[in-house]
Amino acid sequence: MSLPEILPLEVIDKTINQKVLIVLQSNREFEGTLVGFDDFVNVILEDAVEWLIDPEDESRNEKVMQHHGRMLLSGNNIAILVPGGKKTPTEAL
């Protein structure tokens, strides 16, 4: 039995109005509610929170957090988009 084909933009479309975690190529992470996107995967987040990650700190515990309202992220810089948002260690179990 073969699985149905799902295209990347379909996955993103199903994530509208849900929390997402976005990791940029520049070691920055954003979490917020995805309220829009286009064919280039430029995304609009509402209630966005940004973490600046120190690539030298493998524990990833040291993060500088900044709160943003609504923001636009360029699809050219997005490395990973995770539906559901950030998981705490207990949620991941």
Swiss-Prot record:
Signal peptide: none annotated. It holds the Pfam family LSM. It comes from Saccharomyces cerevisiae (strain ATCC 204508 / S288c) (Baker's yeast). SMART domains: Sm. Belongs to the snRNP Sm proteins family. GO terms for cellular component: Lsm1-7-Pat1 complex; nucleolus; nucleus; P-body; sno(s)RNA-containing ribonucleoprotein complex; spliceosomal complex; U4/U6 snRNP; U4/U6 x U5 tri-snRNP complex. Component of LSm protein complexes, which are involved in RNA processing and may function in a chaperone-like manner. Component of the cytoplasmic LSM1-LSM7 complex which is involved in mRNA degradation by activating the decapping step. Together with PAT1, the LSM1-LSM7 complex binds to osmotic stress-activated mRNAs to attenuate the osmotic stress response, probably by limiting ribosome access to the mRNA and consequently translation. Component of the nuclear LSM2-LSM8 complex, which is involved in spliceosome assembly. Its main location: nucleus. It comes from the Eukaryota. It is found in: Nucleus, Nucleolus; Cytoplasm. This is LSM complex subunit LSM5. InterPro entries: LSm5 (IPR033871), LSM_dom_sf (IPR010920), Sm (IPR047575), Sm_dom_euk/arc (IPR001163). Component of the heptameric LSM1-LSM7 complex that forms a seven-membered ring structure with a donut shape. The LSm subunits are arranged in the order LSM1, LSM2, LSM3, LSM6, LSM5, LSM7 and LSM4. Except for LSM1, where a C-terminal helix crosses the ring structure to form additional interactions with LSM3 and LSM6, each subunit interacts only with its two neighboring subunits. The LSM1-LSM7 complex interacts with PAT1; within the complex PAT1 has direct interactions with LSM2 and LSM3. The LSM1-LSM7 complex interacts with XRN1. One of its GO terms (biological process) is rRNA processing. Residues 7-87 form the Sm domain. Changing S74A: Slightly increases affinity for poly-U RNA ends. GO terms for molecular function: RNA binding. Keywords: Cytoplasm, mRNA processing, mRNA splicing, Nucleus, Ribonucleoprotein, RNA-binding, rRNA processing, Spliceosome, tRNA processing. Transmembrane segments: none annotated.
